[in-house]
C-alpha cells in the first residue's frame, strides 16, 4: 500500500515544485520592475494591491519550493520520521500561498490594467492555492493511514522504534 501513496503524491510534488519555481521567476521579475519605478512598463502596472501581492507571492514561492525539498526527502524515505517535516512545511507553505491567493483575488477585484506577466502570476498563485491544499490533504491522509515504515516510530501507539518504552504493568489490587 505504501507504493500507492508515493505514486499519488510524487507527481503532485513535482507539479507544485515546478509551479512554485515559475512563481518565483514571475514574482521576482515583477517586483524588481515595480521597485525600480517602472510601473508604466507593459508587464507591470497594477493597482494598490500589487506590491503586497508581489511580496507574498515571492514569499510563497520560496517557502513552497523549500517545502518541496522536505517533500522529496519524505517521498524517498517514506517513513514517519520524514512525514512530520514534510507535512509541517507543506502546511506552512500552503498558509502563505493562501495569503497570496487572497491578495491575488483582491488585485483582480480592484481591477485596472495589469500586464500579462502579472496576470500569469495571479493565475499560478490561484492554481497553487488549490494544488498545495490537495498536497497537504494527501500528506495528512498518510499521517493517519499507517502506511509508513513501522520502524520509524509510527503513530499506532505501539512505539516500535522506541526500545526504552515498556508497557505499563497491570495494577494489582
From Swiss-Prot:
InterPro entries cross-referenced by the UniProt entry: AWPM-19
Record has Membrane as a keyword: yes
GO CC, one annotated term: membrane
UniProt keywords, alphabetically: Membrane, Stress response, Transmembrane, Transmembrane helix
Transport keyword on record: no
Tissue specificity comment: Expressed in roots, leaf blades, leaf sheaths, stems, spikelets and embryos.
Predominant place of localization: membrane
Induction: Induced by heat shock. Induced by drought, cold and salt stresses. Induced by abscisic acid (ABA).
Subcellular location: Membrane
Transmembrane segments: 9-29, 43-63, 83-103, 124-144
Membrane topology: Multi-pass membrane protein
Biological role stated in the UniProt entry: May be involved in abiotic stress response through abscisic acid-dependent signaling.
Protein name listed in UniProt: Membrane protein PM19L
Organism in which the protein naturally occurs: Oryza sativa subsp. japonica (Rice)
Taxonomic path: Eukaryota, Viridiplantae, Streptophyta, Embryophyta, Tracheophyta
Amino acid at each position: 500500500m505504501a507504493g500507492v501513496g508515493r505514486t499519488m503524491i510524487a507527481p503532485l510534488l513535482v507539479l507544485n515544485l515546478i509551479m512554485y519555481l515559475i512563481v518565483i521567476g514571475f514574482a521576482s521579475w515583477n517586483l524588481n520592475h515595480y521597485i525600480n519605478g517602472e510601473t508604466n512598463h507593459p508587464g507591470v502596472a497594477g493597482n494598490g494591491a500589487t506590491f503586497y501581492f508581489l511580496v507574498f507571492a515571492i514569499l510563497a514561492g520560496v517557502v513552497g519550493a523549500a517545502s518541496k525539498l522536505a517533500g522529496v526527502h519524505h517521498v524517498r524515505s517514506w517513513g514517519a520520521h520524514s512525514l512530520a517535516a514534510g507535512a509541517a512545511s507543506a502546511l506552512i507553505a500552503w498558509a502563505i500561498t493562501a495569503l497570496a491567493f487572497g491578495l491575488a483575488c483582491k488585485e483582480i477585484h480592484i481591477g485596472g490594467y495589469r500586464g500579462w506577466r502579472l496576470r500569469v502570476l495571479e493565475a499560478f498563485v490561484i492554481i497553487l492555492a488549490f494544488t498545495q491544499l490537495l498536497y497537504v490533504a494527501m500528506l495528512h491522509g498518510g499521517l493517519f493511514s499507517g502506511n509508513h515504515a513501522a520502524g520509524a516510530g509510527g503513530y499506532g501507539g505501539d512505539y516500535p522504534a522506541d526500545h526504552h518504552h515498556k508497557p505499563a504493568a497491570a495494577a494489582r489490587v
